[in-house]
Amino acid sequence: MAMSERRHALSLTPILSLMRIAVFCSSSPTIDTKFIDLAFELGAEIASQGSELVSGGGHISAMGAISRGARSKGGKTIGIIPQKLVDIEFADHDSDELIVVDSMRTRKAKIEDLADAFITLPGGLGTLEELFEIWVGRYLEFHKKPVIILDPYGIYEPLHALVEHLETHNFVKPGMRDLIYWATSPEDAVAKAFGR
């Protein structure tokens, strides 16, 4: 093949960029199994679409399920976890890459740095903290990465109403809710992460 033919062939080859999707979710061992199943399905969908999973690096509850789901489809998993949680045997040692950090703050910063998009599943205060930090970062234009809430069970409906209420009293600027994509299925959430 001549040099000009090789250049032409290369120009026709699509350049695919690797997508890393971070998921914020529960590590509570007492949540309903439907939330664990949802996490597993989301992990499987992320891997099925050729993306890598970035998570909090835990092996229990929804956090563990999301990684198992990704691995069930051959996906790469990257866990970011503070040493303190490794010490109490919370770490997902099956992760393809387990990054141990010194604090929760460092964990969140590393997840934000590695991820190209963020999906939040139903969760508790830690999950909400992660969501709010990414959401506010998007609002302040520290990043322009997609932020998605996957909530087929309506857990976050009161949050949506609260933000709307805060908006009516001018504590939150109009359009803040529009910075979040709301999804009701893993397929929809991952599609939104890709901007579809």
PLM regions and their residue ranges:
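Acidic, Ala/Val/Gly-enriched low-complexity intrinsically disordered segments
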Residues: 2-5, 9
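Selective for proline/serine-rich intrinsically disordered segments
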Residues: 9-12, 120, 144
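A cross-family phosphate/adenosyl-ligand binding-site feature
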Residues: 10-114, 152-196
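Short, structured loop/turn "capping" segments at alpha-beta junctions
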Residues: 77, 142-145
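Active-site/ligand-binding-proximal alpha/beta "capping" segment
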Residues: 106-141, 148
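Short loop-to-beta-strand entry elements in the cores of soluble alpha/beta enzymes
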Residues: 145-153
